[in-house]
Amino acid sequence: MSLRRQPDFEQFLKVLLRSGKPDHLPFYEHYASPEFVAERTGTNIDKMGYSDPGYWDIYVDFWLGMGYDCIPMEIPLKCPLGEGHGAASEGSESLAMIRNWKDYENYPWPDESNPIEFEHFDTVAKLIPEGVKIVGGVCMGPYEWTSQLMGVMGMSYALIDEPGLVDAVFEKIGSLIHSTDKQLGTMDAIGALRQGDDLGFKTSTFLKPELLRQYVFPTYKKIVEEAHKNGKPFILHSCGNLAAVYDDIIDDCKVDAKHSFEDAIMPVGEFKKQYGKRITPLGGLDVDVICRATLDDLRAYTRKQIEACFYDGFWALGTGNSLTDYMPVENYIAVLEEGIKVTS
């Protein structure tokens, strides 16, 4: 079923900036797995790469066909990761690329003037119709890149044995991300900048708050400033229990909107009660509920979340994490249908 509606990014902007109740309930997701997109579109996009003909046409149509006002999009840094099964798994020690200063010096760092493949943003900019904007940024944030390049254990040991090396890796990654957002922020087709960077798990952050303040948040602050300098809001997607650092994220980094919520940590409705006057929550419907609930129960659950979060207009409907390859497409469509029906 097509959920196409007249796209209007200005309505999503009202949500992000908390500047007025939008005319419709916007939708937002940080990520959709290639398998989910393939199932929804009836294509083989899950077997395609960014540079394959038609890839971005399918990707853009996927979001527009579900009633989105924006195209969520991220491209990774040109920083090679260790090859092998599980190379993208956080903290895979056997695939760590930087264990010492020699590794750091020999690593093929990209030129800071061209740290990502910007041409993909140019391609999507030509595909989007009037009323639609890209919400874009770098795939993975400073914590995720550093923990993958060094390995979680390797980084942890280095914090004690070789803190200067940890400083250098975080500084380099931060500079590359900052350079990217400095350029993306000037693109007319981009309506907001975003960063995904999973900082924690169910009970706490991976790094102590003081280490996040030392290594991670300075980069957040710089890239948020780039967004604001260009009159654009900034979205942070970060999983985990971040209660110890929400004040840093909101007041120091000045992030405009937060995505990624889990009922077991803090339901999005509770987050809105505590922080909603200072930052906009996005999404938050529990992925497990979406995957397992009957359609009737799922529609009721969706209505409950809308009532809890959209009463003032400052929220966008979506999952608490992402569109996974194991999520039934029809269940997610039921969520969006309910969002359109309840708020039309």
Write out the residue ranges for each language-model feature.
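Conserved alpha-helical segments that form or flank metal/cofactor-binding pockets of metalloenzymes
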Residues: 76-83
